[in-house]
Structure formats: structure tokens, C-alpha cells
């Protein structure tokens, strides 16, 4: 084989490799998703299914809705935002930071009052006034919609002011859960999805406040760019498989 033929083969192979690598990058994009802490377990399950089906890689960042919102308006490179409320996605859309008409309500959350102590068989709102309760964990209402819901419940039960010295505020609902789980707080207002976990039983007891005591926790998602992979992910989130997973983790569907 002469030198010219060898050169032509080398050029052809180079072109094939370039086309292959280019098509691979199109088919398997990376999607960066900011997710409210309460939705972490459900989101991991949804992501595993989506990655298998789509070939895309999803990078998850969990935290409080308020903190994620601040990061996004300051230029954090997220593609999709799954909030624990409808307010921040709405504001992002109004500000032009999020894609117009891309907001969806993906889940409706529920609040519970939880103790991890196994000896506590039954709890209800009366336990909030118990003198043995020294610490009550909540997510910070300034950052977390679940913290706002907890404040609303206590306000409507007329105990918000009397419990101020006992409150331990977590940056997000996951931290509020850890305060109770570790024993640093006897009680805590957390997300129902954190105790209704299909993967592992959570010890202790909980009380579900009537939803008349707090505003509905409608959790919305919004696109932060028009990447096809981002749109594919949001479309998957609305699909039957994702919705079944969401229900399995204790959420109501919109």
C-alpha cells in the first residue's frame, strides 16, 4: 500500500472518530439540576430511570429552595430547577431567567410532625405544649417552603410565639430531619416523604397536620435554558413512570 493510500485511510478514520464523538456528545448531554432537599430520594430514583432510558447524565444538587434561587439569579449554571414551592419558579420566569411557559407542578408535598423516639407511640398537636420538649426542629422559613408551612401550622395552633425559644432551624428540610434523627431535637416538622420511604423504614411516630392549617405545598419545576436534553428531562418528569415514583415516595400528584 502506497503512502497516499495510507494517508487517505488515516484521514477517513479521523473523520469517523470526529463524527462519532460529536454524535455521542449530542446523544448524552449532561444536565445540571437544582433540587429541593425534600425531593432527594424520589429524585434519585427518577434520575436513575431517566439516565438508563435517555443516555444523558444528570448531575443533582440538593439544597433549600431559597438558596438555590439565590444561586440561580447569580448565574449558577443549572439547567433545570425543581423547587419546593411555586413562588420562586414563577419569579424566575417573570424575571426572564427561566424559559417562558415551562413551569410545571410535579408534586404536592405534605408536612408531618415527627419524633424518632420509638417509645412515643402516638403523637399529635398536644405534644407541642409538652414541657419535656426542649427542642423542636424546623426548616428555616426564610429559605424553605416546608419551614413556612411549619410556621403556619404553629401559628394556627396558637403556639408559634410560645415555642420560639425551643425552635432549632435547619437550612433546609434535610437538616431539620437530621436534628430529630440524631436526637438533637425531640420533635421536628419535616416532609412526609422523609418518613414515607419505600427503601427503608424510619423509626418513631408522626402526626400529619390537617392541610387546612397550612397553604398547599405545590412543588414546581422550571427550565433555565432551551437545551433539548433539559426539555427531555422535564418531559420525563411529567410522564407516567416518574409520576408513579413520586407517588411511591409519599407525594400527592397535582
Please report, for each region that a protein language model flagged, where it lies by residue.
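Polar low-complexity intrinsically disordered regions enriched in Ser/Thr and small residues
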Residues: 5, 23-25, 207
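Exported/periplasmic ABC-transporter solute-binding proteins
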Residues: 27-53, 59-62, 66, 70-76, ...
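Bacterial N-terminal signal peptides that target proteins for export
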Residues: 1-13
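Bacterial N-terminal signal peptides
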Residues: 10-22
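Low-complexity, intrinsically disordered regions enriched in charged/polar residues
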Residues: 7-9, 25, 122
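Active-site acidic carboxylates
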Residues: 101
